[in-house]
Amino acid sequence: MTKCLGCGIEIQTISQNDLGYTSNLDNDLCERCFKLKNYGKYTKVTLDNYDYLKIINSISENSLIVYTTDILNLTINNIDKFKKVIIVVTKKDILPKSIKDEKIINYIKTRYKNVIDIVVISSIKNYNLDHLYNKIKQHANNNPVYLIGNTNSGKSTLINKIIDNYSNKSNKKVTTSMYPSTTLDKVEIDLGDLKLIDTPGLIDNTNIINHLDNKEVKTITPKKEIKPKSCQINGKGSLIIDKFVRIDYETITNNSLVIYASNNLNIRFNSLKKEISKNFNNTEFNLKPKQDIVIPGLGFIKFVGPIKVNIYCDKNIKPYSRDNLI
């Protein structure tokens, strides 16, 4: 059985409409990965999490797990069964340089007790990759290392950077993009002294990225350092985040908020709005002091004081509150 070196799917020449199609079984990439890699043409694939969970359940609890999570979301799932987990917080380059790694590491430490290390990285900037690679080798004990995480968490980008930095250059790279579900099955990478296994990303249906078209995904995906937008607020008003989210707020004292999201988004403040998209649902939060609202896949809003907020967004998206990350 020959697998696509980009996404891990089994290669076939029978049906052009099915996954894994290629015109020649000698090709390294399926047609989907070839077009994505060479022309930036993305073909969306609708998957469920059955195969992902099947892979996770097949991994020994004693295996070393490298769990990647996007710094804007910090979504961490399916690690409870494993005894050795390194959490890798990706995309450090999109947060302001003033935000220290220790703040993020300590935040995760207080919430996840069964991790052996937490490393904040930027694959794009090569930041902390030597440190991470040494940690992986230290804990691997010559056994395969599994990389898991949600779709679009930076998993495949990290693997390609590891191939660039530490392999003998004969390894083929896995397919990467800003779009969800690029990896479709397990992809094994043999680095000589280390074997990595990339797995398909868990599809989080509460994440906005899984409900947008390609152009919208480009709009909400930060490509460079975020410039936080802050505002002093009092009384009632609305925060509009492009066409994706509306947040109505009500505070009885002076308050402030800071928005961490892509610089491409049109963000504005208005007096309390009444019109609501028919596809938007309302979620109400009564926030305590120093809490965030996270819009999965989009970013987060930091509030300083207590405040009541109503969040209107796509009915599939599930915003949530947490203690201030920053």
Stretch-by-stretch model annotation:
Residues 2-65, 69-72, 83-86, 92, ...:
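Helix-rich effector regions associated with P-loop NTPase G domains
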Residues 51-55, 77, 103, 131:
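Well-ordered alpha-helical segments embedded in enzymatic catalytic cores
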Residues 56-60, 74-83, 108-112, 136-139, ...:
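Alpha-helix C-terminal capping segments
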Residues 66, 86-87, 119, 146:
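A structural signal for isolated positions on well-ordered beta-strands in alpha/beta enzyme cores
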Residues 76-79, 96-102, 206-209:
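Conserved ATPase-coupling elements of RecA-like P-loop NTPase cores
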Residues 94-153, 161-165, 173:
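Canonical P-loop GTPase G-domain recognition
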Residues 158:
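Hydrophobic positions on the alpha1 helix immediately C-terminal to the Walker A/P-loop
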